[in-house]
Amino acid sequence: MNESYRCQAATWVERGSSATMGGVAFSAGLLGNLLALVLLARSGLGSCRPGPLHPPPSVFYVLVCGLTVTDLLGKCLISPMVLAAYAQNRSLKELLPASGNQLCEAFAFLMSFFGLASTLQLLAMALECWLSLGHPFFYQRHITARRGVLVAPVAGAFSLAFCALPFAGFGKFVQYCPGTWCFIQMIHKKRSFSVIGFSVLYSSLMALLVLATVVCNLGAMSNLYAMHRRQRHHPRRCSRDRAQSGSDYRHGSPNPLEELDHFVLLALTTVLFTMCSLPLIYRAYYGAFKLVDRADGDSEDLQALRFLSVISIVDPWIFIIFRTSVFRMLFHKTFTRPLIYRNWCSHSWQTNMESTL
């Protein structure tokens, strides 16, 4: 049988493989997303009666809620199949022998679907952050929570249609080593256009989304840095402008500490998101345009798939849990207060010197 992948037709989990990493990833993802949902509920996101005590949810939190639900569904649908394969020492194709290759195809579809849907929602969040900071007038007029609710369904519908193309004959799903993963086939010995074409198309779309997300985050970081510099050089004028501006960035202008929070989190998000997405994009292009020895490439493909799955684990911790007041308090006590005190001492010393002169 002329197969492109060593474990393509395997019926058992490859020896030497352990379920430890899969179990840890599932536990971390499940805990993070459940904790994120609890924090979102406590923040008043689910309130149906806006008012002084229950302000309407911001667009950002609506988008975060959609991303959290998407990641949680992905973890609950995908990870149990991996753990079941390890527990029974059977590959995905053999977990349900009567279904043939359907379970493997369903797993691969879910992997590609949730990977694309989450990336689209991450781009929407990055775009929302950039618009709110760099184009506040356009943001206030056109970006609303009601429109933000549509992001998750629209991203899901697009991802559903796109990732279902292999079922229509364009693209192919295949089982990867150690027999507990299935995903888009990224190499074909006969260089079939229908197989390689979908792999390149999927990876190209992911690359464009990653690039757009990084650009938006860098733009938002640039705006935050400019705001922070203005606050340091003109603290009184900035405070007066904040008080007179009424409703500004997300129902209230951020103070300098919040600006620093956002800057650090955006930088961390950009680095982690890029690191987790690029391995899969690289493997897809590498398999499409170079002759690959599958005996040497299976481990790299598995690592790329694992990196992709890390995004859904990291998302809730970065976007929600690290934004809570408890984390901010610890962060400010550890890093921000010494920095502010040092800057204040330097500014006071400079002022005293100028007054004596």
Swiss-Prot record:
It is found in: Cell membrane. The keyword Transcription does not apply. Keywords: Cell membrane, Disulfide bond, G-protein coupled receptor, Glycoprotein, Mast cell degranulation, Membrane, Receptor, Transducer, Transmembrane, Transmembrane helix. Residues 1-20, 79-106, 171-194, 283-306 are extracellular. Pfam families: 7tm_1 (PF00001). One of its GO terms (biological process) is vasodilation. Residues 42-57, 128-149, 216-261, 328-357 are cytoplasmic. Strongly expressed in eye and gastrointestinal tract (GIT), moderately in the brain and oviduct and weakly in the epididymis. In the eye, expressed in the epithelium of the iris and ciliary body and in photoreceptor cells of the retina. In the brain, expressed in leptomeninges, choroid plexus and spinal cord (sensory and motor neurons of the dorsal and ventral horns). In the stomach, expressed in the mucous-secreting goblet cells and the columnar epithelium. Expressed in platelets. One of its GO terms (molecular function) is prostaglandin D receptor activity. Glycans are attached at residues 2, 89. Gene3D superfamilies: Rhodopsin 7-helix transmembrane proteins. One of its GO terms (cellular component) is plasma membrane. It comes from the Eukaryota. The chain crosses the membrane at residues 21-41, 58-78, 107-127, 150-170, 195-215, 262-282, 307-327. This is Prostaglandin D2 receptor. It comes from Rattus norvegicus. The gene is Ptgdr.
